[in-house]
Amino acid sequence: MSKKLYIKTYGCQMNVYDSIKMQDLLYPFGYEPTENIEEADVIILNTCHIREKAAEKTYSELGRIKKLQDTRTKQGLSSAIIVVAGCVAQAEGEEIFTRTPYVDIVVGPQSYYNLPELISKVVRHEKHLIDLDFVEEAKFDQLPEQLYPQGTSAFISVQEGCDKFCTFCVVPYTRGAEFSRNVEQVYREALKVVSSGAKEIMLLGQNVNAYHGKGPADKIFSLADLLKHLAQIPNLERLRYTTSHPIDMNNDLIKLYGTEPKLMPFLHLPVQSGSNKILKAMNRKHDREYYFDIINRLREARPDIVLSSDFIVGFPGETDEDFEDTLDLVRRVKYGQCYSFKYSPRPGTPGATRTDQIPEHIKSERLTILQQELMAQQLAFNTSCVGSTMKVLFDRNGKFDDQIIGKTPYMQSVYIQNPNKSLLGKIIDVKITKASLNSLTGEIL
């Protein structure tokens, strides 16, 4: 009888990819995935630590799992093995056992390949096992190739860690220094997902455009080199990557938007603030003028490119003038979509120790103003698409039986009413008939 594995994933696309790999890793040991936590023999929370609220969600979920465990015990059933994985695990370590002593395993992002052994030890009644080692390439060398198809759009992790040490960010402490997978590993995985039906690949990394993987004859490939190499794969229609740092947007990568049709005209390029003073305090290693130059060069290479970004409001020391600089940058760039957050002090980062923290009510006010501007831009861009014909990759069923959903080259969701589910996995010309803030509606031509 097979055992059941339940994984709940928080945070970024990298965590989604890691969860897929953990699922593939445990399958040969008899663990089949389930979406029903109540029947699980192993429960894994793959956690995010980028903001305080995200970390507290982990502990709230662990509290709910404890109640589930107590119910199973009363019913005479065995308890599930509880695993906390991901960046909360890496950041908090033994503290997790202190706060939630019923957790069995704490494992960091670089040690997932040890999960079968750790789970086996718990089965043999060992408790409070922890593995937070940084082993860099060993993670990619020892995780299995894909077992379960990812679908029409697939994630492939090519780079991990970050050397930038932005003063608000925990990633260098939870994911370690930058390292890149070798080209052959990435290419083999890309061939595998395409042969399983993927038409689109999203390359992942904490700082993916810093990619510098070893290729044939020990040549070091940049991200632009890797994208050109992957673009040669037959039946692969679309390439994307995330997340990028402006300082690593080199000329070869920018020019590729004008020469490689498989590279989609959408780029998530976080800037975080429009104030030079705050950018310096954040240790972003560039100023707003540098960012504007990157944007201008991208638009010269690919005039229809659509941009996305991340913004943090209320970083320590941010004045009204600094915030106005952020609004000015937003209005000058004109984004298609964005993510924005209030600054959240993360333990162990330089920003958390500053004495000029911004009051919560001011952060909330600024976030509301910024989000109103960003939503207006997003709606304006979506509305500008009405009446146009766009190539849509249909990748999933909708909420209703006669509805399917796809993605434009610009990462917009498109809904159509069509009972022909054979369109899934295909790129089809769609006339856009309606726009809302978060999606488009269209008709098959």
UniProtKB/Swiss-Prot annotation:
A molecular-function term among this protein's GO annotations: metal ion binding
GO cellular component: cytosol
EC number, as in UniProt: 2.8.4.3
CDD domains reported in the protein's UniProt record: Radical_SAM (cd01335)
Keyword Heme belongs to the record: no
Residues binding [4Fe-4S] cluster 1: 12, 48, 87
Residues covered by the TRAM domain: 383-445
Residues the record lists as binding [4Fe-4S] cluster 2: 162, 166, 169
Localization (cell): Cytoplasm
Residue ranges of every copy of the MTTase N-terminal domain listed in the record: 3-124
Pfam families attached to this UniProt entry: Radical_SAM, TRAM, UPF0004
Cofactor(s) for this UniProt protein: [4Fe-4S] cluster
EC top class named in words: transferase
UniProt entry keywords in alphabetical sequence: 4Fe-4S, Cytoplasm, Iron, Iron-sulfur, Metal-binding, S-adenosyl-L-methionine, Transferase, tRNA processing
Catalyzed chemical reaction(s): N(6)-dimethylallyladenosine(37) in tRNA + (sulfur carrier)-SH + AH2 + 2 S-adenosyl-L-methionine = 2-methylsulfanyl-N(6)-dimethylallyladenosine(37) in tRNA + (sulfur carrier)-H + 5'-deoxyadenosine + L-methionine + A + S-adenosyl-L-homocysteine + 2 H(+)
Domain Radical SAM core: 148-380
Function: Catalyzes the methylthiolation of N6-(dimethylallyl)adenosine (i(6)A), leading to the formation of 2-methylthio-N6-(dimethylallyl)adenosine (ms(2)i(6)A) at position 37 in tRNAs that read codons beginning with uridine.
NCBIfam families to which the protein is assigned, alphabetical: miaB-methiolase, MiaB/RimO family radical SAM methylthiotransferase
HAMAP family named among the record's database cross-references: tRNA_metthiotr_MiaB
Subunit structure: Monomer.
UniProt protein name: tRNA-2-methylthio-N(6)-dimethylallyladenosine synthase
Species assigned in the record: Rickettsia rickettsii (strain Sheila Smith)
Organism placement in taxonomy: Bacteria, Pseudomonadati, Pseudomonadota, Alphaproteobacteria, Rickettsiales
Gene (name only): miaB
